[in-house]
């Protein structure tokens, strides 16, 4: 079970598959074990507006320049106030659900993607993103260890050792 990020924020990186390059401005951890990184392009779009941040799995990230790396924690439990899988409630709207994804942004804004229980007909409902300060811990919920599954099947190129 992954419990820490591999890469620091504010480094120049690229996606090893597509070649997309940018500054690593966000990193997120998922209840089901993966970590992703948000790369913000350094150049503007053709219309002069900022280009969209793109997210890539940790295994696809290649660091190009770590000169300006942020001095930040990498352990999830030292970054986030509420553990993954916790049942939480939004203090503003009353929305309640489980924290499935936690995101750390470069400029000190941690956010949680929370998904509510199924509706009265048993249908899944859409989750919502909330800033950390808006959420109150309700209960333990489900731990990452309870949903961890061993890898099965073929080896994908992203799982092979890299130089």
What are these regions (language model features)?
Residues 2, 9, 14, 58, ...:
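Low-complexity, intrinsically disordered short peptide segments enriched in small/polar/basic residues
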Residues 25, 61-63, 79-82, 102, ...:
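Weak global preference for isoleucine
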Residues 2-6, 12-60, 91-93, 98-134, ...:
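Basic/aromatic-rich interaction segments and small domains that mediate binding to polyanionic partners
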Residues 61-66, 126-128, 132-163:
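Beta-strand-rich cores of mature extracytoplasmic or soluble domains
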Residues 1-11, 64-87, 159-163:
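Mixed-charge, Lys/Arg-rich low-complexity intrinsically disordered regions
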């Amino acid at each position: 079970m992954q419990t820490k990020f591999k890469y620091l924020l504010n480094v120049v990186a690229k996606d090893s598959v597509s070649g997309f390059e940018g500054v690593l401005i966000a990193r997120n951890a998922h209840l089901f074990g993966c970590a992703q990184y948000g790369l913000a392009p350094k150049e503007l779009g053709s219309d002069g507006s900022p280009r969209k941040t793109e997210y890539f799995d940790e295994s696809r990230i290649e660091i190009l320049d770590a000169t300006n790396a942020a001095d930040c924690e990498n352990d999830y439990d030292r970054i986030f106030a509420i553990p993954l899988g916790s049942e939480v409630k939004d203090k503003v709207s009353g929305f309640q659900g489980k924290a499935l994804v936690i995101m750390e942004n470069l400029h000190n804004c941690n956010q949680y993607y929370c998904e509510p229980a199924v509706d009265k007909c048993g249908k899944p409902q859409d989750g919502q993103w909330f800033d950390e300060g808006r959420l109150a811990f309700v209960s333990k919920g489900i731990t990452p260890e309870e949903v961890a599954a061993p890898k099965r099947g073929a080896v994908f190129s992203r799982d092979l050792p890299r130089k």
